[in-house]
Regions:
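Divalent-metal (often Zn2+) His-rich catalytic cores of metallo-beta-lactamase-fold enzymes
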Residues: 83, 174, 180, 203-261
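Surface-exposed cleft-lining segments at the edges of enzyme active sites
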Residues: 192-202
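Active-site environment of divalent metal-dependent phosphoester hydrolases
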Residues: 41-43, 69-74, 96-98, 167-170, ...
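C-terminal regulatory/interaction regions
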Residues: 254-311
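Active-site neighborhood of phospho(di)ester-bond hydrolases with catalytic His/Asp-centered motifs
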Residues: 36-39, 60-68, 90-92, 162-165, ...
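Core dinuclear metal-dependent hydrolase active-site scaffold
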Residues: 26-27, 144-175, 180
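Conserved beta-strand hairpin/beta-sheet module of binuclear metal-dependent hydrolase folds
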Residues: 3-54, 172-185
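Active-site HxH/HxHxD metal-binding segment of metal-dependent hydrolases
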Residues: 52-150, 250
Length: 311
């Protein structure tokens, strides 16, 4: 089952909050809670409104967990710090370095502004839920996470799993008793209405495929995605991962076949970027075309094919 409309409780230990486009997950057990995902800046005011309405006490939140250091996954962290005083921020070493880089966060604020305007325009948030401008271009991390670490929330214990491929800093988290997996972006941008994916192996095709297969083998029964949905039920989770893996492989094949047939890399990036832009439109066309150029580069590198770098 695809769950797409927060705020909603998913079992007794998990709340899907934030917006459908940028969900925030609140895990709770034994009188304490943790927030997973750092969202766009508007997720701060949205989350505050939601937890107030749900009667969740801010002092219960003891940890703020970042899945990876991209602008749509870290920009609400400063608001979360204020909302949950004393709660440490957890992220990978690479994500921590990015989040502490003023130049990177300065760029992120521009992306965040565009995403905020898009959310307002589509009615996902109100004007009053636009976050104030950043006063400091750094987002500090208190605890660095790595493969094999554990995050404890009451009696729940989440295994930290390095899942590179979308980014080198991507982490996923799995609670084996409740069978909850929080998987960030590595499995692709899933569109529940059509049950299709836009693969996002922005750093490495092979690693992305391996990470997705590793997550598929966990036996999760609840999969919390970085965008658009939570997948519940063992059978639907199995189908989700099968679809994600097939989508990654098919997109890769499409790229390789097109280039081998003589398609210019720049033209292909333009075509692929226009396709996904038409489906989401969250950022300007050239943003998606540049990201598709990364997918082309990584697919061709995997095949050992050298061509002119697509622009």
């Amino acid at each position: 089952m695809d769950i797409t409309n927060p705020p909603i409780a998913i079992g007794s230990h998990l709340l899907m909050l934030g917006t459908s486009d940028y969900p925030i997950y609140l895990v709770k057990d034994g009188g304490e809670a943790a927030v997973f995902e750092g969202g766009v800046s508007a997720c701060g005011p949205v989350l505050e409104r939601q937890i107030t309405a749900l009667g969740v006490a801010c002092e219960l939140v003891k940890q703020i967990v970042v899945t990876h250091g991209h602008p749509d996954h870290v920009m609400a962290v400063p608001a979360f710090r204020k909302m949950f005083p004393g709660a440490p921020v957890l992220a990978s070493q690479i994500a921590a370095a990015t989040m502490g880089n003023e130049k990177a966060i300065g760029f992120f604020t521009k992306i965040d502004g565009a995403l905020t305007a898009w959310l307002v325009g589509k009615g996902a948030i109100t004007e009053s839920e636009k976050a104030p401008a950043f006063t400091e271009l750094k987002i500090l991390v208190d605890r660095v996470l790595k493969e094999g670490d554990t995050i404890r929330v009451g009696g729940l214990s989440f295994d930290v799993i390095a899942t590179p491929g979308h980014s080198d800093c991507s982490l996923s988290f799995f609670e084996p008793v409740r069978k909850i997996a929080i998987v960030a972006d590595v499995t692709g941008f899933y569109m529940p209405a059509t049950k299709t994916w836009w693969p996002m192996y922005f750093t490495d095709y092979t690693a992305c495929l391996a990470s997705t297969r590793r997550l598929a083998a966990l036996g999760a029964e609840v999969v919390c995605l970085a965008h658009n949905a939570v997948i519940t039920g063992a059978d639907d989770v199995k189908k989700y991962f099968e679809g994600a893996i097939a989508s990654i492989e098919a997109y890769h094949k499409r790229i390789v076949d097109a280039v081998k047939a003589g398609k210019d890399g720049r033209a292909l990036a333009g075509e692929l970027g226009a396709e996904i832009h038409a489906k989401t439109g969250s950022l300007p066309l050239d943003f998606f075309q540049k990201n598709c150029s990364l997918l082309i580069k990584n697919s061709l590198r995997h095949e050992g094919i050298h061509v002119e770098k697509p622009a």
